């Protein structure tokens, strides 16, 4: 598992609310749409606000999002409830935001809420990462575009697997026999 995938799993597990969906051509603006930012369906409103928006009113809040454990955006969560619109969006990513490109269509967007105004964002780009994320949370592609059920307990086997991946990813060279035996003992005892 990649470091990004491991981090995405950990952040989703420890989050208040988490959400995932596939990035569309509308999101990237590459199909000529005038849409701004990532669309969030009404069923995931609690990811953005403590209570759903009220038709006839707009509401918004500013948040900090840490992307890929690397860089931040000062983004805006907005509910458009006036006129004919009735939708939620995440906007304000800055001009050089790397995930609004045509090649990002089909990537998996993950948003995890850490606090009222601090979030983690991840974009998984490979089929293997997406499949592993789905497998970990027992999801399928049809189960995206909604909040992720993080209440499911994690099996001890999955916990060991995650811990092994964390340890393995910290090495650049294969450890020696004595070091490997010590790591195995530590993993078993913890």
Protein language model features and the residues they cover:
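Nuclease-adjacent, charged terminal/linker segments that flank catalytic cores
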Residues: 2-17, 72, 76-79, 85-89, ...
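Short, contiguous, well-structured surface segments enriched in hydrophobic/aromatic residues
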Residues: 64, 70-73
